[in-house]
Amino acid sequence: MHILDTNVLSELRRPAKAHKKVRAWAAAVAVSQFYVSAITILEIELGALLIARKDAQQGAHLRAWIDGEILPRFEGRILPVDTAVAQRCARLHVPNPMSERDALIAATALVHGMTVVTRNVADFRASGVDVFNPWE
């Protein structure tokens, strides 16, 4: 099972323009194997809100994508930050702190025995989580 990082969701947002390796990988894996962290939802929500402040039309497109595609597509497969994830995340910060959001995504994957799918492999390496880069 795979937890998709924000950059993977963004890449697949417009399949015709997505990198061919990312498209091929996504097509080869059963949709039921794709999960997202609640932190990824936070990141795409934040991005949409920030863009909407500068460009209402683009913000509306992103809102439609989130509400019409992402949330329904991942219904039942959005993993929360619960006590086990919070405790695992805390351990990831000692002795070397890492980005809070990345640590929460990594901790979610570790608790659930999943692989993080991301272009930002280096951001997750220190956590010990299995990572896959579909661009390579």
Residue ranges and their predicted role:
Residues 11-12, 47, 88-89, 127, ...:
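Residues that scaffold the ATP/ADP-binding catalytic core of kinase and kinase-like folds
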Residues 9, 41-44, 86, 124:
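A generic structural signal for short hydrophobic patches within well-formed alpha-helices
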Residues 1, 106, 110-136:
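Acidic, PIN/NYN-like endoribonuclease modules and their adjacent C-terminal/linker elements
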Residues 4, 100-101, 127:
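A generic structural signal for residues located within well-ordered alpha-helices
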Residues 1-36, 50-67, 136:
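Short, well-structured N-terminal submotif of metal-dependent ribonuclease cores
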Residues 33, 46-51, 60, 72-119:
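Active-site neighborhoods of divalent-metal-dependent phosphate/nucleic-acid chemistry enzymes
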Residues 19-22, 41, 63, 67, ...:
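A general structural signal for well-ordered alpha-helical segments in protein cores
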Residues 38-39, 82, 120, 135:
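Residues at the C-termini of beta-strands that transition into short coil/loop
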